[in-house]
Amino acid sequence: MAKRNVATKKKVVKKNIARGVVYISATFNNTNITITDEMGNVICWSTAGGLGFKGSKKSTPYAAQQAVESALSKAKEHGVKEVGIKVQGSGSGRETAIKSVGATEGVKVLWIKDITPLSHNGCRPPKRRRV
């Protein structure tokens, strides 16, 4: 009889990182939160869609807040105490995500940067909606 292949889950190695960088990507459809160390190696991540928000609920400020809280709770397990914030995009969850990082206990915000790419008359924007 053939052996069954049993999938084994990789063990998450707990790192001891004091400082991290929180990348907030706030699009019109979703909010992605990625936490890295200072070198850019990913520690943990979370998205509004990954937390169970589907459809238009993913783009709400509440979903962005929940995504930040989820990512920071994972990052605290790795010892993150001080963070810098890099924000990209102009979605509705942008401001709420920044505020909820600052409101989280045990995490000190050192700096905030906006890394949204600005085009100098680049691609043609999508046509206007007709409702």
Curated annotation (Swiss-Prot):
Pfam families hit by this protein: Ribosomal_S11
UniProt-listed GO biological process terms: translation
One example GO MF annotation: rRNA binding
GO cellular component terms given for this protein: ribonucleoprotein complex; ribosome
Presence of keyword Plastid: no
Keywords: Ribonucleoprotein, Ribosomal protein, RNA-binding, rRNA-binding
Oligomer status and interactors: Part of the 30S ribosomal subunit. Interacts with proteins S7 and S18. Binds to IF-3.
Family classification: Belongs to the universal ribosomal protein uS11 family.
Described function: Located on the platform of the 30S subunit, it bridges several disparate RNA helices of the 16S rRNA. Forms part of the Shine-Dalgarno cleft in the 70S ribosome.
Name of protein: Small ribosomal subunit protein uS11
Organism: Helicobacter acinonychis (strain Sheeba)
